Regions:
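Extracellular/periplasmic carbohydrate-active domains that bind, remodel
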Residues: 1-204
Length: 204
């Protein structure tokens, strides 16, 4: 268990490979402003961002604030049974500052979150490294506000086996939504998007 007191500001990041049955909560701030900033693609240069997990199961993150991320603020790779609830993300670093990235993961619920990011707010993607399906992903009752990116994007990285049972609902979006953008041939099934307010929805 990781508890961040609601009056605390912690400078650093959370990084975990292979963790199980972890709860992270508390209402405080996790500030990533001390991590090195680079102007190239941060993922390729091993910058971790504020919160990154690999191959994890049964992770619950609630009520914390993530800010000033050097790259994707909250990202998960090859994870399952992840619950993100009432998390606030604020980041204006203009290079690769996605809000939440769900990569080759399954059984993920993201709800009641506020995300202000310069790049994509929520991005669901698959990369060649894992070659696993991405399935059972729900985004519910979230407020999303991006800069030059997209709100709720599926892609552009779609190098996976299958996308299945993905739902966006009851969300407020500040700008356009790019639902599907693929450079690979990938099967999609059971996809649903029900927004309360947004400017436009686009599938490409």
């Amino acid at each position: 268990t990781v508890y961040i007191d609601d009056e605390a500001v912690v400078f650093g990041s959370i990084y975990s490979p292979g963790a199980k049955n972890v709860k992270i909560f508390g209402g405080g701030v996790l500030d990533n402003s001390t991590e090195e900033r680079i102007t190239e693609h941060c993922y390729e240069n091993h910058t971790k961002g504020t919160f990154r997990i690999y191959n994890c199961e049964n992770i619950d993150v609630s009520d914390i604030i993530l800010t000033n991320s050097s790259t994707w603020a909250l990202s998960m790779f090859d994870c399952k049974n992840i619950h993100i609830d009432n998390v606030k993300i604020v980041g204006h670093w203009k290079y690769n500052t996605d809000g939440i990235d769900v990569v080759n993961s399954e059984n993920v619920l993201i709800e009641n979150c506020f995300i202000r990011s310069f790049d994509d707010t929520i991005s669901i993607k698959a990369i060649y490294d894992y070659q696993k399906p991405i399935q059972n992903i729900t985004v519910d009752n979230c407020v999303m506000w991006c800069g030059w990116g997209k709100n709720c994007e599926i892609g552009i990285e779609t190098d996976g086996i299958e996308y299945k049972n993905i739902v966006f609902k009851n969300c407020d979006s500040s700008t356009n939504i790019q639902l599907i953008s693929s450079k690979f041939i990938v099967p999609f099934s059971k996809f649903s998007c029900r927004y309360s307010r947004s400017h436009s929805v686009k599938c490409v």
